[in-house]
């Protein structure tokens, strides 16, 4: 019995793609994961004209301090930030211009946290992951019929397969909260997936284990030195962040339609509060619970 899970982990570890993503900056206390959801809009998926080619539609910082609550912070992809060597632009432009390394540098500059592990999930792999666990339950109060993402929804909760889960995670334009609402749905989807993966019944289903690991590792690209055990630690940290003693949300936001120049509509983070917010996240002194969100919320 012991040989099966050990062999499965070794097999899965060998299937994960690795890239040179980390900056080599001096370590900061605690452990910081940068999670990015990349979306090439290929394979017959309805295309959003604002996201030609590969983009990061999901950018999250997961920080485990030396003491204090674990924090999962969604960084709006349209947040207006300074990108090293490029100037001010939308956060996800860093990935377009310089891939994972420039995204890591940009997030480190914004947050003051050194990224220890970079984990990129191909959005196409989300569909396979959801199907591999037999579907997930998702909830939304919105009425949606969105051609760009493919999301069709009536208010309430329901069990969905991979195609609908992917549309749920992608939809932005039909949500009054825009990028912020999408970030909340993406966190909900990841939590639902994590709950299914942690189900003890999965241990008794070797075939489903193999399908899940195959889908998961096939969808992942991680930084050099990040292995399957680090991903296990990430999953535990994510669960802690989503629990009662964790922190979830966004940095402080002051404007959802900030137009600083030739980059269109962006999200403006609060320039006065954001540095202190991330300093408190790093130190483990920010209070547990939801944080950030819509201006005035």
Where are these regions (language model features)?
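Non-catalytic, solvent-exposed segments at the cell envelope interface
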Residues: 1-297
